[in-house]
Regions:
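Residues that define the transmembrane beta-barrel architecture of outer-membrane proteins
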Residues: 34, 64-70, 108-114, 129, ...
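Short glycine/proline- and aromatic-enriched beta-strand/turn motifs that initiate or cap beta-hairpins
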Residues: 21-77
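Outer-envelope beta-barrel architecture signal
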Residues: 32-38, 87-93, 127-133, 177-181, ...
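Outer-membrane beta-barrel channels and translocator barrels
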Residues: 79-81, 123-128, 174-178
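Membrane-embedded beta-strand positions of outer-membrane beta-barrel proteins
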Residues: 38-42, 72, 93-95, 133-137, ...
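Transmembrane beta-strands of outer-membrane beta-barrel pores
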Residues: 42-48, 76-78, 97-103, 137-145, ...
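Extracellular loop and loop/strand-boundary signature of outer-membrane beta-barrel proteins
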Residues: 56-60, 102-105, 151-157, 192-199
Length: 219
């Protein structure tokens, strides 16, 4: 009980900090509108076989090699003429929610993650193209955990709630005014930090593609 409360608290604190940044920006740069964004991501990835469960030692006796997830994200960034916009150019932050399928609902589940994220430009490649990074951190819910009687093969997940950590590197195309297309690669890790056993964890590596719509809103 205490373990999942800790994970939720960490996620809430991260989201609260992002909201506090937006509120503080509103107080200090009220003459400059924030840029708000709504985006969707689709991420097909490879399940790294770090445990025999993924190699085929499961109820179906079939290797598990793939996973997909869909993400809905809200972000904001500071106006380039504002104080924070000058300090942190090309930086964005926000909150996201994602749905994950590992194609084994009976043994692993189909978890939903809620997370804070932040990204920024690494380098500009052309007038419309840049190389960016983005990290996600939050909590994932809805896992099917190990049980010696009903889920005995699943040594990778020991709790119903697990931390979600992700790092990605993206090519960001400016398609048109207010529209961005992103493609790239990322790494993800799910675990409970050994607060419950077994906890081999779930690790993935793969691709991602996303579309973001940006708009200026005076608040």
């Amino acid at each position: 009980m205490k373990n999942w409360k800790v994970l939720i608290t960490i996620c809430v604190l991260g989201c609260t900090r992002i909201c506090a940044q937006e509120t503080g920006a509103n107080d200090t740069v009220s003459r400059h509108p924030l840029t708000h964004g709504v985006g969707i991501d689709f991420r097909p990835v490879y399940l790294i076989p770090t445990n025999e469960f993924f190699a085929g030692e499961n109820a179906a006796w079939q290797p598990l090699r793939k996973s997909v997830s869909a993400h809905l994200k809200y972000s904001f960034r500071f106006h380039p003429d504002s104080r924070y916009g000058k300090l942190y150019p090309h930086t964005y932050q926000g909150i996201g929610v994602s749905y994950h399928s590992f194609f084994d609902k009976a043994e692993i589940g189909t978890p939903v993650a809620v997370y804070a994220f932040q990204g920024a430009r690494i380098t500009r490649l052309s007038s419309r193209l840049s190389l960016d990074y983005e990290w996600n951190f939050g909590a994932s819910f809805g896992w099917k955990k190990y049980h010696p009687g009903t889920n005995a093969y699943n040594y990778v997940v020991g709790s119903k709630i697990n931390a979600y950590i992700n790092l990605g590197f993206l090519l960001n195309w400016q398609l048109a005014a207010g529209w961005q297309l992103t493609t790239g690669i990322d790494l993800s890790h799910f675990s409970n930090g050994n607060t419950q056993y077994p906890n081999a964890g779930v690790n993935t590596v793969g691709g991602r593609i996303g579309l973001v719509h940006l708009s200026l809103i005076h608040i």
